[in-house]
């Protein structure tokens, strides 16, 4: 009796994983973001690949592991950040994202770490310039060039429900991997 339910559960989890993978390919980007670069690379287990960022302004890095598990470390004080020395980091088992503030000194060092649990990790990193305007602390939008405040774009942080959905997908995919690993 358990075999039909196991098959149905595996089918359900597999379909969720496929729809999750399709959603990653079609990730939503806020209106004020401009894609600057797409970088693909590989990094061995326990090693780092280093990149250098020279673009000014607020930059957003979005990285996803194509294979294995790659983590992201960022620093404006060293060009070789690591898990011991960094200012910003994202070390998740899924998509990694870091917002680099405009005040960071350039060049900014970016370290991509290949987690030891995988022999090799492949990653794709998208580099965005964030041109959205943040509200001024006193209610007025801060414009460096003095343009009309009526033309401002509201700054909206990512929707919390979207973040919760992402965590749910990560958990479901992890469960699917575990079940498949146990069965095969």
Swiss-Prot record:
Which InterPro entries does its entry note?
Answer: UPF0669 (IPR031420)
Q: Where in the cell is it found?
A: Secreted
* GO BP terms, alphabetized: apoptotic process
Q: What is its main location?
A: secreted
Signal sequence span is 1-23
Pfam families (UniProt xref): UPF0669 (PF17065)
Glycosylated residues, per the record, are 47
Q: Name one GO cellular component term.
A: extracellular region
Query: Which keywords label this protein?
Result: Apoptosis, Glycoprotein, Secreted, Signal
Q: Which domain of life is it from?
A: Eukaryota
Function per UniProt: May be involved in induction of apoptosis in CD4(+) T-cells, but not CD8(+) T-cells or hepatocytes.
Q: Which PANTHER family does the protein's record reference?
A: UPF0669 PROTEIN C6ORF120
For this chain, the family text in UniProt reads:
Belongs to the UPF0669 family.
Output this protein's name: UPF0669 protein C6orf120 homolog
């Amino acid at each position: 009796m358990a075999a039909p339910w196991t098959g149905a559960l595996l089918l359900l989890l597999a379909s969720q994983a496929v729809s999750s993978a399709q959603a990653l390919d079609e990730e939503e980007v806020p209106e004020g973001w401009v894609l600057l670069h797409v970088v693909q690379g590989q990094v061995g287990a326990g090693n780092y690949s280093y990149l250098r960022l020279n673009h000014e302004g607020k930059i957003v890095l979005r990285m996803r592991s194509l294979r294995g598990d790659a983590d992201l470390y960022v620093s404006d004080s060293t060009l070789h950040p690591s898990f011991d020395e960094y200012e910003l980091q994202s070390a998740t088992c899924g998509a990694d994202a870091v917002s680099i503030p405009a005040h960071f000194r350039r060049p900014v060092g970016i370290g991509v770490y290949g987690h030891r649990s995988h022999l090799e990790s492949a990653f794709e990193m998208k580099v965005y310039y964030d041109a959205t305007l943040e509200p001024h602390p006193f209610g007025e939008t801060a414009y460096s060039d003095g343009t009309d405040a009526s033309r401002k774009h509201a700054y909206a942080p990512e929707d919390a429900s979207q973040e919760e959905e992402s965590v749910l997908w990560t958990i479901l995919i992890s469960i699917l991997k575990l079940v498949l690993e146990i069965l095969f």
